[in-house]
Amino acid sequence: MFIYDDNFLSLEQILELSQSVTKDNKDIIWHALKGTTDIKQYPEIKNSNMTVSEDGQTVHAASFNETRLSEIHDLGSNILHIFAKKHGIEIKEILRIKANILSKTEKQDHIHPPHVDMTIPHLVLLYYVNDSDGDTVMFDQKYCAEETPTLTVNKTIAPKAGAAILFDGLTYHSSSSPKNTEERIVLNINFLTV
């Protein structure tokens, strides 16, 4: 399953999100992390000139296991429910909502380690808060605990403010840091369906 939608929120909602989910919002507690994942062994990527390496990222945890940790939970939950209603998806439980900020890098043809957010069946809604050139890379392969697969790129998605992608949470994916814009800001929502 993969859905791309850049026409499910009003312009007012898109602007509210872009003004709320920033480093400048003093109501949000941001944490600087050394990497985007905790993966130690990177999967190989076939037929690609992409180099896999880490960059630091700034993260805000908005909710975890249905526990609301900040106002960003409400914004993320609202985005998810609007998207789900439009696409006929029944939400059972929100597992996690977090905001990620990746800063500009000089690295070329570089992506972060391919990963899955959780190793249980779930869906991911990735909402792009701002326009950026830090693409998301989707792979054909799914997570399997017994092996680290060789990956093939399925598609890349350029971040566009107000757009979101929905995909099977067991599908390997990667982020990348922007090279031309200052920041790439996303809301990452992991959830279960009925």
Language-model-detected regions and their locations in the chain:
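Non-heme Fe(II)/2-oxoglutarate
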Residues: 1-90
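Catalytic core of non-heme Fe(II) oxygenases with the double-stranded beta-helix
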Residues: 69-77, 81-187, 192-194
